[in-house]
Amino acid sequence: GWYLFIALFTLYSGFTLANIAQLSWASFIAPEYDERTKLLTLREIIAIIATLIVISIPAVIEIYEGSFILKINAIGVFALVGIPLTIFLGLFFLDDKRTASNYDNPLKSFKRFFKNKTLNRLVLASVLLAFAQSLTGGLFVIFMDSILELGDYASRAIFVNFIFAVIGIFLWRYIGLKFTKHFAASLCLLYAGILFLLQFFVVLYISDASESVKAGVLFFVLAMYGISFSGAAPLIISMVADVSDAEQAESDVNKSGAMFAYYTTITKVGYTLAVAFPYIFLESVIGFDITLGSDNSQFTKNTLLYMYHFIPVICFFLASYILSKHNISREAHSTIKENIS
């Protein structure tokens, strides 16, 4: 037990720290408004392609009726090879030049960030997005098994979702470049909320259909929802970088690293709550038993169905509204950059 805790804590902490450094680095590599949109959406595309490679492993094993343990072990072997290779490439093949700039104490910066309304709107939107996506991700296999009785299709369904996520990023990237980042991100989350609400009614409609019909219809709905899956996150990150420029123009201190640490730390709260809350509520409050699958009571299955759909829908709509109020446009950012220089 302790070995697993320490291993996961170390791995997750290292990933988080590397992620903060990478996001902060992006604000230096792409200092202009549209350059950041291009860079961070490209980063997301590469990340999803890498994710597709990983999730294709259990999907392929699933087709050949491999066991659950075999799926987990295969991903573990991939990680054992991939992580050291990534570290090696990052340390020895990436050119990183230190730039001269004023820096501030991160803890002192955090106090200032708590008062930054523009930043905190983005952070709140990110927390809502993280909570919604983490909740649906954590409950997806349970939902497929207990509600639709399609547990054997779960890995392939996730694979379809991620394929269309790659396609969707190009759409939201185009809208962000054509109009503004906050408009594209807000529209993306509005679309996600509508699609997830539609999925709820589709699930009710196909609940008594044959297995093949349920799988086909659900795959189509997941594909349409997948278009929105990774569209908002890179745009929000790009907007945080713009806010760090505004902060630097005001204080003459570069706080991008501290700001992304602040943003990432609070966003992780959304992920953490979404992982813990559903299982505690389902098992301890309403008595849902994961091991029973579709044999759970109708009340507990209905609770799962409503929780799985309506909590994310509310989060998506709220985040969409919050992002629509963002106040740093392309023109405003140009003025900010002039003040820095």
Give each language-model segment a name.
Residues 1-341:
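Membrane-embedded alpha-helical bundles of multi-pass transporters/translocases
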